[in-house]
Amino acid sequence: MSKPIVTLATCADFPNLDEDDRGLPQALSERGIEPRIAVWNDPGVDWSNAGVVVMRSVRDYARKRNYANFLRWARSLERPLNHAEIVDWFGDKHYLKDLAARGVPIIPTTWLEPSANLSKHQVHTRFPAHGDFVIKPAISSGGRG
């Protein structure tokens, strides 16, 4: 009888997984599962043979023009643990608006949409003159973006 397969999807920046995930393959093996690691956009990977696919260190999805390709790939998976609809919702930080509308506390957030085409001065005037703040693209991952 063959072992169940779990493929940990990552990106080319972390072909052997992120440091926090490096213990996963051994933990899966110890539980009788065949672990695999694959870069999500590697054309040489046969995803139809990947078993359950768990998206882990797929951080490069946020790079320009990668997001649509990433979602296309996520939708093509036969057995994803992270379903494409959730990945799409969670991949764009506007999901925080949905959470706030349902009463979940979020950090104070000012949304600056790219279509507003604001100058640096206009962006600066949207924030209080005191305190720290973070400017981050809506589609970003980790501390990147």
Give a label for each model feature:
Residues 2-31:
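Short, charged N-terminal beta->alpha structural module
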Residues 2-10, 71-77, 85-145:
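Active-site nucleotide/adenylate-binding loops and adjacent lid/helix of ATP-dependent enzymes
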Residues 10-11, 56-57, 82-84:
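Short glycine-centered, acidic/aromatic-flanked micro-motifs in structured strand/loop junctions
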Residues 16, 62-63, 143:
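Glycine/Thr-rich phosphate-binding loops of Rossmann-like dinucleotide-binding domains
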Residues 18-22, 68, 93-97:
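Short, surface-exposed alpha-helical segments at coil->helix boundaries
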Residues 29-45:
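A short, well-structured beta->alpha microelement
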Residues 34-38, 81, 110:
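General small-molecule cofactor/ligand-binding pocket signal
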Residues 47-74, 78-79:
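Short, structured active-site "lid" loops
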